[in-house]
């Protein structure tokens, strides 16, 4: 089976979010199960630097100018990159300029990604042709439309990683994209008078997946669908919408072998985890005290992630004698608010603005509790890392968080299924109650260690997810 993943990011070469982690791990897992898998990505500077020995496959005259398709191998996975310096060789973010403004030609930059995917399905590379094109998020959504316009030379799967980002562009750009005019309609890629790359994927793909079963159900409801509920309800009725839970790359996120943490440990040597906590307290300017429960956040600072709820619930955490370590960046007001709390509570609250992959590993290993209070969360990887590292997740019951964390309710403690702390309502009061439950359990060290071991026993490797996706591909062929 020949499979092409189409995406805008690829860990560890380029990452702005969890999408990169997924596409960085899934192809290898599918290859291990016998599939012939390659990845198509734009030639952003970091990706080109990671594939210095790529070979030319073809030079193409496109609606976005002349481009070169190149091919190389990265960590055992074949990677096609679109070499188009006039589109992709820009410093900083792949999506916006230094002032956080989206690039004015993003419609061309990411339409080209989908167009090249369709070209590969039409034998652009004479030595390899995909049977399945698997497009990820809005950046790759037009791949499904271009395939449909060419009579579907390959089957297509479209995965929604976050429906909130839809890739909306002015309708005047349609003539620039080499798509049939009749595609711009309600039964197509038109969305309230605009071109929607997300809707193109949702409508034209043979099958739509999301990154957790609960999120697949949630996005059929208006409060989660961002205006797409009608289309997604139709998909669900047709049986062409499903949720497949993301996995964790055990070669990168594994406390038993993680070279980025102060001391490795496993379920059987959980006491060694304490050394990581002391190192983290020192690094974050917190009081070095193993008896203080250490809550941690590794997140984009946005309302979606519920960090405003955490701000409002912080008095409960601080009055309970706990500490908070936060690593993240995003909304300027949230950044300032957390920095102000850190200044007001030195030794108890530590904040680092920005994102550092290596330091996120140290936080995961050193924390007692990982807080993920999201208003919505398609899958979430942070809570999976927390489970893996025995840092109990405190999460809101939504999306993939609901699918992966079981609350420390009495019945769950009794039957051994408890793995963290769950609150349901998106408000500070319910979050504060979950914080209090965590503090109560912290006061019972034997029970806390028992739940830690249960959390670390959970299995969320990529093998199972890869198996589910390959089964889906086989049904489509």
From Swiss-Prot:
GO biological process, one term: glycogen biosynthetic process
Domain of life the protein comes from: Bacteria
Key word Ligase present: no
Gene: glgA
Protein name, entry field: Glycogen synthase
Keywords, alphabetical: Glycogen biosynthesis, Glycosyltransferase, Transferase
EC number(s) per entry: 2.4.1.21
Species annotation: Edwardsiella ictaluri (strain 93-146)
Recorded GO MF terms: alpha-1,4-glucan glucosyltransferase (ADP-glucose donor) activity; alpha-1,4-glucan glucosyltransferase (UDP-glucose donor) activity
Catalytic activity: [(1->4)-alpha-D-glucosyl](n) + ADP-alpha-D-glucose = [(1->4)-alpha-D-glucosyl](n+1) + ADP + H(+)
Pfam families assigned to the protein according to its UniProt record, in alphabetical order: Glyco_transf_5 (PF08323), Glycos_transf_1 (PF00534)
Record family assignment: Belongs to the glycosyltransferase 1 family. Bacterial/plant glycogen synthase subfamily.
Physiological role: Synthesizes alpha-1,4-glucan chains using ADP-glucose.
Functional pathway: Glycan biosynthesis; glycogen biosynthesis
A cellular component annotation (GO) from this entry: cytosol
Binding annotation for ADP-alpha-D-glucose: 15
């Amino acid at each position: 089976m020949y499979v092409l993943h189409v995406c805008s990011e690829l860990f560890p070469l380029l990452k702005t979010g969890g999408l990169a982690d997924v596409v960085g791990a899934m192809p290898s897992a599918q290859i291990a199960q016998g599939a012939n898998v390659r990845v198509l990505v734009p030639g952003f500077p970091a990706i080109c630097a990671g594939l210095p020995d790529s070979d030319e496959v073809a030079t193409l005259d496109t609606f976005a100018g002349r481009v070169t398709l190149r091919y190389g191998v990265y960590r055992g996975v074949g990677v096609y990159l679109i070499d188009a310096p006039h589109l992709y060789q820009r410093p900083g973010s792949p999506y916006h300029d230094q002032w956080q403004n989206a690039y004015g030609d993003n419609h061309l930059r990411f339409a080209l990604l989908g167009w090249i995917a369709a070209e590969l399905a039409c034998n652009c590379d004479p030595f390899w042709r995909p049977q399945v094109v698997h497009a990820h998020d809005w950046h790759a959504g037009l791949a499904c439309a271009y395939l449909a316009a060419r009579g579907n030379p390959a089957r297509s799967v479209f995965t929604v990683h976050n429906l909130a980002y839809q890739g909306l562009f002015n309708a005047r750009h349609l003539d620039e994209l080499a798509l049939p005019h009749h595609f711009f309609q309600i039964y197509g890629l038109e969305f309230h008078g605009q071109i929607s790359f997300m809707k193109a994927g949702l409508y034209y793909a043979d099958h739509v997946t999301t990154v957790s079963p609960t999120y697949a159900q949630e996005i059929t409801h208006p409060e989660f669908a961002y205006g797409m509920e009608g289309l997604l309800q139709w998909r669900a009725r047709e049986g062409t919408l499903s949720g497949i839970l993301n996995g964790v790359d055990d070669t990168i996120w594994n406390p038993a072998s993680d070279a980025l943490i102060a001391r490795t440990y496993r379920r059987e040597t959980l006491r060694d985890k304490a050394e990581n906590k002391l190192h983290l307290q020192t690094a974050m300017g917190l009081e070095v005290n193993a008896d203080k429960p250490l809550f941690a956040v590794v997140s984009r600072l946005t309302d979606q992630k519920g960090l405003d709820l955490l701000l409002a619930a912080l008095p409960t955490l601080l009055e309970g004698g706990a500490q908070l370590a936060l690593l993240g960046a995003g909304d300027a007001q949230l950044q300032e608010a957390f920095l102000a709390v850190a200044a007001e509570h030195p030794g108890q609250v530590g904040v680092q603005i920005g994102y550092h992959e290596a330091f996120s590993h140290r936080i995961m290993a050193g924390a007692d509790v990982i807080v993920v209070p999201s208003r919505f969360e398609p899958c979430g990887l942070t809570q999976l890392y927390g489970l893996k590292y025995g840092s109990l997740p405190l999460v809101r019951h939504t999306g993939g968080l609901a699918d992966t964390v079981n609350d420390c309710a009495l019945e769950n403690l009794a039957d051994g299924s408890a793995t963290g702390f769950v609150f349901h309502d998106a408000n500070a009061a319910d979050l504060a109650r979950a914080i209090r439950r965590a503090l109560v359990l912290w006061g019972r060290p034997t029970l806390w260690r028992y739940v830690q071991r249960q959390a670390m026993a959970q299995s969320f490797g990529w093998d199972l997810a890869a198996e589910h996706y390959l089964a889906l591909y086989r049904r489509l062929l």
